[in-house]
Structures are given as C-alpha cells and as structure tokens.
C-alpha cells in the first residue's frame, strides 16, 4: 500500500491516490466523510472550517460499494478557492495580479522562509500553500480507507487529549477502552474528563482574545493488534519507528513517545519492563503495558499507546517579528487565517495517520490480493499466536 497527496490550501481541490488496497473491501464515500467531518470539528476551530464542508469524491478503484484492487482516487473540493481565483491561477496572469496576496514576511514556526530559500520562491505563498495543514484533509481521507481495513480485522482505535495548552487532563481510573473512546468522541475537546471542559474552553477563549495559540499532547490507543507485526531484523523494519516518522510528519507535531515514554528516563528497568504471563484461554499477555505495546520494534499483543506533542499553531493574530525578504528590514510576520488551537482536529489526523501505517504493515505482511484472502490469513495468524 502506498499513497500520494496533492493540492494547495486555496487551490481548487485536494487529491490522494492510494495503491495496494485489496479487492472486495466495502467502501462508501460516507465512510470517508465521517472522518473528514471529525477533522473539521472541535472547540477552537476558525473561520475556514465554517466555509468548507469537506466531502470526498471517489473517481476510481471502487465499484458498487466494493474496492476493485485498482488505484483509488479521492478528491475533496476547496470551496474557498472561488475567492482566490487570481491568486491561485494555474496560467500566467498580469504582474499586478501576481502581487495580490504575495507573502514576503515569513511567519516564525512555519515553512515560509526555509521553503522559499530551498525552492527559490520570490513569493512565499508557494511554500505556504502546500505546507498548510489543509493537506491533512487527504491524510485523513486515506486513513479512513485504512480504518475500514482494520475494522474488518477486528482492530479499533481512539485518541484523546492528555495535556491541553498546559492543562493536564485528569483521567478517571479504570476506564475501559470503549469508555475512553465514547467519552472522547462526545467531547468537543477530545478529552475524557467532562469536569474540565468548561475550564479549557474558557482558556481557549482567552487565548483567542489575546491573538495567541496553544498546543498540547495527544494519545492514540489501538486495540486488537496481534503480537509480531514489525521486525527487529533491520532498522527500517521496526514498526514503532515507522509510526514515529508518520506522527512527526503531521503539521506542527514535534515529538512522539510510546507507553510511558520519556518518563522511562526517571525509572529503573524493574519498573518499566512488562512482565510476561500465559493462560490457556488467552495465550501470552503482560502484567502491564509500560512499553506501549512494542518490544524490539514489534507489537507485543498489548494495546498500542502512541503519544504526540503538537506545538502551538505558528500563525498568530498578534504576529511576531520577522524580516521582509525584499529589503531585509524588520517587519511583523504575515497574518493568515488561523485557529487558537487545533488539538481536537490534530487528534483525528494522528489517529488516521496511525491507522494508515498499521494497515500498510498488515497488507505487506499478509497475503492481501482480496479482503477474503487477507481476513483468512490474519485469522490464521491470530490462532497461531494464541497457541504458540
């Protein structure tokens, strides 16, 4: 399985082409639209999300509600493009129109300046448009297809916010996977403690009035993955490493950890390692899951626990100082439309990116020309692991 995305933030559309999806997977536009709508939600989103109503168009690889094994083409129309026809025109236009909405005051924390340097842009909008988080629309669309595969194999997932703008979420003890999932899904903030909703919303409103932004830490949990996915044989075969790369590829993500993560630096080995158990009914298990479901780059059969830290959005309504790329004089950075926070949306993106990596690993590990073939191979492997 592989995919490419294309499109600009204010261009006519966004596109993804996915190759390697088995034939016979039940797939409808509504499956993808559901994830796209989740990405657009969450408290703190800005005006752009009120303009766009993301709906996918499937133009290849699916017939009568089933995948055919051919490449799948997904497209999402940018409604806002109608206001940017001159600025984002494909053909050559008058010089005066080219200067319309030109970006020459790069924003600290964005790809504007370095992208302009790398690709020799006189107008930093050429970097801004592609590096925008709008691209993650298609990462979510691809992830929605991946989640359909995982669902057919009995794998489920959730995400929730652990730290929201410096506020630590108090996680009620002994919540089951399903309880965590339901609480997060029904929260505008993707948190599992409803008692903290008001405090955080008030804080977001305050940050918005100040023209500032906030980030946080997101946790994604995956249930139902058997032991043995990934490999220790080569460095690039380690599944946790693949997940780390994928999570860090999401806009504004600056760190990733598994299980108790960086807290391991303060603990002894006897406190960190997950003791092994075995029962006739369940096979191998663990007393704990401090390592987040990974050993030696391979899954252990425990839930996968992946955490990502998202920096505050770098576009500020009270912009920081920058430099004019023409005169090199100090100047306030360009202001583009932005949100005080996009943490709930980022959680949806992270969840779908993780799903994509896991689906790809499974498709590369098991015979998967068709879904029935994949389901049998995966079921046989689960049975083997249980009796090992």
UniProtKB/Swiss-Prot annotation:
Keyword NADP in record: yes
Binding, FMN: 130-132, 251-252, 296, 311-315, 337
Reaction(s) the record says it catalyses: 5-O-(1-carboxyvinyl)-3-phosphoshikimate = chorismate + phosphate
Cofactor binding summary note: Reduced FMN (FMNH(2)).
GO CC aspect terms: cytosol
Residues involved in NADP(+) binding: 39, 45
Entry keyword set: Amino-acid biosynthesis, Aromatic amino acid biosynthesis, FAD, Flavoprotein, FMN, Lyase, NADP
Catalytic activity, EC: 4.2.3.5
One Gene Ontology MF term: chorismate synthase activity
InterPro entries: Chorismate_synth (IPR000453), Chorismate_synth_AroC_sf (IPR035904), Chorismate_synthase_CS (IPR020541)
Biological or metabolic pathway of the protein: Metabolic intermediate biosynthesis; chorismate biosynthesis; chorismate from D-erythrose 4-phosphate and phosphoenolpyruvate: step 7/7
One Pfam family linked to the record: Chorismate_synt
Reported function: This reaction introduces a second double bond into the aromatic ring system.
PANTHER family: CHORISMATE SYNTHASE (PTHR21085:SF0)
Family as reported in the entry's similarity comment: Belongs to the chorismate synthase family.
Protein name: Chorismate synthase
UniProt source species: Streptococcus pyogenes serotype M3 (strain ATCC BAA-595 / MGAS315)
């Amino acid at each position: 399985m592989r995919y490419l995305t294309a499109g600009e933030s204010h261009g006519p559309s966004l596109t993804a082409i996915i190759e390697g999806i088995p034939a016979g997977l039940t797939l409808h536009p509504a499956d993808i639209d559901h994830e796209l709508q989740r990405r657009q939600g969450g408290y703190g989103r800005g005006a752009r999300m009120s303009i766009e109503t993301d709906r996918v168009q499937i133009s290849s690889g699916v017939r009568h509600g089933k995948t055919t094994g051919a490449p799948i083409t997904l497209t999402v129309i940018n409604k806002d493009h109608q206001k940017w026809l001159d600025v984002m025109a494909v053909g050559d236009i008058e010089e005066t129109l080219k200067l319309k909405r030109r970006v020459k005051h790069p924003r600290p924390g964005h790809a504007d300046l370095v992208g302009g340097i790398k690709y020799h842009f006189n107008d930093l909008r050429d970097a801004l448009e592609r590096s925008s988080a709008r691209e993650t629309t298609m990462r979510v669309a691809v992830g929605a297809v991946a989640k359909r595969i995982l669902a057919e194999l009995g794998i489920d997932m959730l995400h929730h916010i652990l730290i929201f703008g410096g506020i630590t979420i108090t996680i009620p003890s002994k919540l089951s996977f399903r309880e965590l999932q339901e609480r997060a899904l029904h929260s505008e903030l993707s948190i599992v403690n409803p008692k903290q909703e008001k405090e955080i919303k008030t804080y977001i409103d305050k940050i918005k009035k100040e023209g500032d932004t906030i980030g946080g830490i997101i946790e994604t949990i995956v249930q139902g993955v058997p032991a043995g996915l990934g490999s220790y044989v080569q460095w690039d075969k380690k599944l946790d490493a693949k997940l780390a790369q994928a999570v860090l590829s999401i806009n504004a993500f600056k760190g990733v950890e598994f299980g108790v993560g960086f807290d391991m630096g303060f603990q002894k080995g006897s406190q960190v390692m997950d003791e092994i158990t075995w029962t006739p009914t369940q096979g191998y298990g663990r007393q704990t899951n401090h390592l987040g479901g990974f050993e030696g780059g391979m899954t252990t059969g425990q839930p996968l626990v992946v955490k990502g830290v998202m920096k505050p959005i770098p576009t500020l309504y009270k912009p920081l100082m920058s430099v004019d790329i023409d005169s090199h004089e100090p100047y306030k950075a360009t202001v583009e439309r932005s949100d005080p926070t996009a943490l709930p949306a980022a959680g949806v993106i992270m969840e779908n990116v993780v799903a994509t990596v896991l689906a790809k690993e499974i498709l590369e590990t098991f015979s998967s020309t068709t879904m029935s073939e994949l389901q049998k191979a995966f079921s046989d492997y689960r049975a083997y692991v249980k009796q090992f």
